[in-house]
Regions:
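Chalcogenol-based redox active-site neighborhoods
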Residues: 1-156
């Protein structure tokens, strides 16, 4: 799968998610979309990242932006994670990695000398016309949600 390019149309997807049941990117035209990919529910870095987006949610909403978190975890796992952390946004479940592959976020990783394929923490900003306007790869959690918000504010 080719890596999506900033300036081009964002890869369109349909997926299952918390709350709404399903999400179809093509039906979200007219809204800015923040799509953040994270490795695993209820782990320290992923929890902090979600909390940071949660804490800035009202500011994102004021800018007309929807936030979606996405990982390979099950919908049940996402529902528990969302509830426990009081996330006001939806989490997309991608167990077959279809959306992950469209956005080219599955990468070889290493932990304790063991190599495996996993989600490379990444965020994509999609404008109201469905165009990919910014991407962040190999995201460091600290300050990231604020950086995404600042980028949206600068789009005006």
């Amino acid at each position: 799968m080719a890596t999506p390019k900033v300036g081009n149309k964002a890869p369109v997807f349909k997926g299952i998610c918390t709350g709404m049941g399903s999400v179809d990117l093509s039906k979200l035209k007219g809204k800015k979309v923040v799509l953040y990919f994270y490795p695993k529910d209820s782990t320290p870095g992923c929890t902090t990242e979600g909390q940071n987006f949660r804490d800035l949610y009202k500011a994102f909403k004021k800018e007309g932006a929807l936030i979606f978190g996405l990982s390979r975890e099950s919908l049940k796992s996402h529902e528990n994670f969302k509830s426990k952390q009081s996330f006001p946004f939806e989490l997309i479940s991608d167990p077959d990695e279809k959306i992950c592959n469209q956005y080219d976020v599955i990468k070889e990783k290493s932990m304790y000398g063991r190599k495996y394929m996993g989600i490379d923490r990444s965020t994509f900003l999609i404008d109201e016309k469905g165009k990919l306007v910014q991407e962040w790869r190999k995201v460091k959690v600290t300050g990231h949600a604020q950086e995404v918000l600042d980028t949206i504010k600068a789009m005006k």
